[in-house]
Amino acid sequence: MRDLKTYLSVAPVLSTLWFGALAGLLIEINRFFPDALTFPFF
């Protein structure tokens, strides 16, 4: 039961950090390549 409580307290923190980093990455990509339907990396 203690492991379940530890998991339930760690998972929201990790998911918040992950989604925050993902949102920041998407914002930076949209800043450098605005309105890109395909990425001009090729």
From Swiss-Prot:
One of the GO BP terms on file: photosynthesis
UniProt cross-references to SUPFAM superfamilies, sorted A to Z: Subunit IX of photosystem I reaction centre, PsaJ
UniProt keyword annotations, A-Z: Chloroplast, Membrane, Photosynthesis, Photosystem I, Plastid, Thylakoid, Transmembrane, Transmembrane helix
Pfam families: PSI_PsaJ
Record flagged with keyword Membrane: yes
GO cellular component: chloroplast thylakoid membrane; photosystem I
Subcellular location: Plastid, Chloroplast thylakoid membrane
InterPro entries: PSI_PsaJ, PSI_PsaJ_sf
Role played: May help in the organization of the PsaE and PsaF subunits.
Identification of the protein by name: Photosystem I reaction center subunit IX
Annotated organism of origin: Solanum tuberosum
Lineage: Eukaryota, Viridiplantae, Streptophyta, Embryophyta, Tracheophyta
Gene (name only): psaJ
